[in-house]
Amino acid sequence: MDDLQLDGIHVIQKKDGFRFGIDAVLLANFANVKNGNRVVDLCSGTGIVPFIIAGKTKASSITGIEIQEDMVEMANRSAMFNKLQDKIEFICEDLTNIDIMKKIPKVDVVTVNPPYKLYNSGIVNPSDKMAIARHEICCNLEDVIIACRTLLKDNKRMYMVHRPDRLADIITLMRKNKIEPKRIQMVHPNTKKAPNIVLIEGQRDGGAFLKWEPPIYVYNDKGGYSDQIEAIYGRK
């Protein structure tokens, strides 16, 4: 069990299974969730993004959607442990099943930390559960974007974390599915290295206007977390 150091929230995770990384923390921080918003988190894993959003905002409800049953079970146990079951729920569904997505009441915000790697690229993790989390096995990038559009109310927004080498694909597929890119932020390991994470906000049926946010640098010159990251973790 991991302590998020946020309102006493703890998240149940397996030591030898998929564990959340800084990308999920960055995504939860990047998402603009307003008081009373209803939120869906796709590819939710063990629920780190919903739990951070619950701790930092006054969202009225947060639903995590995850295809792997054991992760859903752990996430719901975490919700009960933190006495957040009235605010957060996790359901085991396939986001490519658009009929199911259409049955979910439309929301103000969708967040997603999808598999980054194409199925036929790199070495596929021998553990199926790890591979599903990292490779486009159960869904691809367009499936994710279509699900986001299906879940969003008119003019409401999605937030995604991904890899910069897929940015052209992300923007192309967002526009194909009438989600307009509105805000992009690059994340670099440090000031000397190229970005390895991209955060992007899109608006369903939005007008054309794109804002570039200042970059985030994860580590400082001494090898410790930067002031930006310390602030995101609530330590500054």
Predicted regions and their residues:
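Short glycine/threonine-rich catalytic loop with a Thr-x-Gly-x-Asp
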Residues: 18-20, 43-46, 192
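Mobile active-site "lid"/loop adjacent to the S-adenosyl-L-methionine
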Residues: 114-143
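Conserved SAM/SAH cofactor-binding pocket of Class I
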Residues: 30-123, 146
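Conserved Class I SAM-dependent methyltransferase catalytic core
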Residues: 10, 138-188, 193-195
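Class I SAM-dependent transferase core
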Residues: 1-34
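A structural micro-motif
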Residues: 9, 37, 60, 86-88, ...
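SAM/dcSAM-binding transferase cores
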Residues: 192-236
